Amino acid sequence: MRCRHCGSACTYKASDELDTQEALDLCDQLAGLGIELVTLSGGEPLLRDDWHLIGARLVEQGVKVNMISNGWLFDADAVNRALEAGFSNCAVSLDGTEEVHDALRRTGAFKHACSALRAMQQAGMGSAVITTLMQDNLDLLPRMHPLLEDLGVQHWQLQLGMPMGSMTMDRVIAPSQVETIVSFAHSLLNRGPIQPVLADCVGYYSHHYQEIRASYFVSDLPWNGCNAGKSNIGILHNGDILGCTSIRAPEFVEGNIRQTPLRVIWNRPGAFAWNRDFSVEDLGGFCEKCRYGEICRGGCHNVKLTMTRSLRDNPYCTYRAQVEALVPKIHQMRDIDKLLDRARKALALDMYEIAETCLERANTLSSDNLDILQMLGYAHYQCRQYQKSRDITEQALMIAPNDAYSWHGLGNALAKLGHIIEAEQAMLRARDRATNDERLMCDLENDLRILKSGDRGIGGMRPSRPLTDNPRSNNHSSAFRHIGLSPDNP
């Protein structure tokens, strides 16, 4: 179809595609590796005459198989072949109303997509729709919903169009518009049979996002970072092996099955190191200080690469958008008591980015306030800003050189910066000054034990939390209200 938003920008059939025997051998290797689910996609998988044979080979070996199609060739006969082969379901790409969908793809594409969904409905095959969202169609979601209900669609996946292939930057939605997608998906939860699904590129960690993910994703965490090369594998038409088919620049190709068995590629030392070895220390920008950085790891790597040319920071995040919307309001505040009150509440709710912003603002208004400096040092630490934590805590010690809490905070910051001897000295000074603080003494003994055992346990060290009586909450909507700051509450 040569779609205007296709991430592949394919013009003609590739000359180096795997042939049928190579594809079937690959199926055996995938099953042997313990793969549980395979999705056939493209391009357009139905352009291969052997697509059903590939699916059947996988199913025979206990692998669940589904497919993503544009629907043009997925007629009643193809649906029957998919069912006979054992496909669990099929997703059809549908990107708007007929006018918009055909403009993005080609005339007649909308009718073929709807016909494919109707054929699946009549045959009793599980169906899904995938909608790639951009400026062209973001406002069309409410108009699409009744049609999808009529076509018996069971799952509706919403994903971002990224500037790769034929997709141009001017049509990519703004980071602030991701919340529109999440809010719409959330509105579907109790409206009928269609299960909304957020693709991995849409997130992360706003309250609505967590509720949507929990409705279909069984896990302790709604999102725990990109799984490319960890539990996911991507295979290109020519047998190139990737962590994710969206991330396919030459430097991300781990090998080719025509030269190397899949198991060898997968288990090779150093394979997929760009993601397997990725850690919170590799983050930057907002993601570096985000409370969810250690588990989220910056969301979808492909979004970061296409939008920032780096894996460090992800602007397309609903939680980030909520927090950053508050920054101008905080910067306008001049009442130190209110800033401190909001900071304490934010710290109690582990919303460290907001606490840090409130305290930085308060510090510009009163730079010699010990309470502000102590809490700001703690907030910097929790935001993984260890040098800032050290600098601010040293300022606090200039005001109160015998303050045990500040010496403890300095010791933690120094340890994170790799200054182990200096960290231990600061901890000992804190212990000498904390004789009447049982909680702080307990924290200090634990941290000194970690320091003496070597730096392997430093990741478990934490400065003592400032005392607060405020309740904790994972509901960000109520949390923002409790703090007294929200996008709708100055």
Model regions and ranges:
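Flexible mid-to-C-terminal extensions adjoining Fe-S/redox cofactors in radical SAM and related proteins
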Residues: S246-K338
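Radical SAM enzyme [4Fe-4S]-AdoMet core and its adjacent flexible, acidic
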Residues: L18, E84-A85, N89, S93-D95, ...
